[in-house]
Amino acid sequence: MLKLASLNRIVLTGTLLAAAGLASGCSSIDRLSQIGESPKLTAIDNPTTQPGYKPVQMPMPKPETVSYNANSLWRNGSRAFFRDQRAARVGDLLTVTVNFTDRANIANQTQRSRVSKDDSGIADFAGSKLLGGTAQKVLPGRLLTTDSESLSDGKGLVQRQENLQTSVATVVTQVLPNGNLVVEGKQEIRVNFEIRELIVAGIVRPEDIQSDNTIDSSKIAQARIAYGGRGQITDVQQPRYGQQVMDVLLPF
């Protein structure tokens, strides 16, 4: 059984290494064809047609009857005299101001120590020697002795500081039954041989949209903000495929 398990493990490891090598080879061919060229920007497309897209489902309140004000110059929820310029329908644009500043400094230290010692024997009982003569020489009076010691020492330190300030235009991809808007936007900027990507998605309440059709990222519910890149600099920062595979397979 042990030999069979070892054989299966070797076969699995070889299969994974072969797959990794094949993927690495295909990726290497693509990279060889792009030597000396800047990375290409992705095409503009409909985010709802992307693989893995799923409509947002949130708990909704009961529908309410819309009331209209008779003989009024203003429409409910309107902030402009002639027309509300804020995003309200699928396909409308909404500018998101990303202002993210995060700083964390956490330090933990734990120390634990425990020492126990037990010693038991039955050399004398009720005034008489239980072990005597030859038996006392062979069997010691101390029948059981235990000694244990446990020590635990742990330290943890987290220091993080992040700052991101930018703006990105998003598209309304869905209007929920309660009127909230699902927005998603992607921005790509190419500088030399590196592309910086900014992705913003989440749920927006129409009342939080400013009159200039902008909203702060802190007012987006279920916000998903990703800022990264791809290109030569990002490629150098990534470990090689073989190293990543070995990090997964090796238990130590």
UniProtKB/Swiss-Prot annotation:
Keywords: Bacterial flagellum, Cell outer membrane, Lipoprotein, Membrane, Palmitate, Signal. One of its GO terms (biological process) is bacterial-type flagellum-dependent cell motility. It comes from the Bacteria. Assembles around the rod to form the L-ring and probably protects the motor/basal body from shearing forces during rotation. Belongs to the FlgH family. This is Flagellar L-ring protein. NCBIfam families: PRK00249.1-5. PROSITE patterns: PROKAR_LIPOPROTEIN. One of its GO terms (cellular component) is cell outer membrane. The basal body constitutes a major portion of the flagellar organelle and consists of four rings (L,P,S, and M) mounted on a central rod. A lipid is attached at residue 26 (N-palmitoyl cysteine). It holds the Pfam family FlgH. Residues 1-25 form the signal peptide.
